[in-house]
């Protein structure tokens, strides 16, 4: 870490106090690579700013064209997960604060998030796993009922909530950039790299 990385785009912690006190509308997703930074900003902005703040968290991949997709990777979240009115929301936001027109865009709680799950354990006609989910509104972040849990990788390759004994021998592997371990799913930028890998949820 040196001067090259010391900028607002790469290190929000050092520059969070430099943000102007203006209305902020944030849009991110569970499979977008900015979700951690965006929710961290939400927490810190609420401590510092008096202007209105709103956030929407969906299921799409990183990229505007995926906002109308009901799936990410090989998982389908249903038609209800699609954010149809994003342009309408943006126009309402700008009209509210640039034209001083009351658009009701500030009505409702701070956060609107898509809670993934509650779907069936089968696949649809396109072969996507039906995972389902629903939209939830919240005035607080993290949302009420959130439980933070630490998971640890054990010798058998499984995750466990019990921290391994420090006396256990570590698991080691050799990293060879000429023969890398394949990447499948998750938060990838851009979501489709030359048709080689795709972001989202996959059965691995």
Short names for language-model regions:
Residues 1-105:
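Active-site-proximal cap/loop segments of hydrolase catalytic domains
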Residues 72-204:
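C-terminal, loop-rich substrate-recognition/catalytic regions characterized by aromatic stacking residues
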């Amino acid at each position: 870490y040196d001067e090259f990385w010391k900028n607002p785009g790469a290190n929000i912690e050092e520059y969070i106090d430099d943000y102007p006190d203006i209305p902020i509308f944030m849009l991110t997703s569970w499979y977008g690579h900015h979700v951690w930074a965006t929710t961290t900003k939400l927490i810190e902005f609420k401590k510092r700013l008096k202007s209105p703040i709103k956030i929407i968290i969906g299921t799409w991949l990183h990229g505007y064209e995926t906002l109308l997709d009901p799936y990410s990777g090989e998982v389908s979240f249903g038609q209800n997960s699609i954010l149809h009115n994003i342009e309408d929301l943006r126009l309402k936001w700008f009209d509210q604060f640039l034209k001083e027109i009351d658009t009701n865009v500030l009505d409702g709680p701070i956060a609107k998030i898509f809670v993934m799950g509650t779907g069936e354990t089968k696949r649809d006609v396109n072969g996507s796993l039906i995972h389902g989910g629903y939209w939830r509104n919240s005035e607080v972040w993290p949302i009420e009922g959130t439980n933070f849990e630490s998971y640890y990788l054990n010798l058998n390759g499984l995750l466990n909530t019990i921290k391994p004994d420090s006396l256990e021998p570590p698991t080691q592997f050799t990293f060879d950039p000429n023969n890398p371990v394949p990447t499948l799913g998750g938060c990838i930028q851009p979501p489709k790299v030359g048709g080689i890998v795709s972001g989202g949820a996959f059965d691995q």
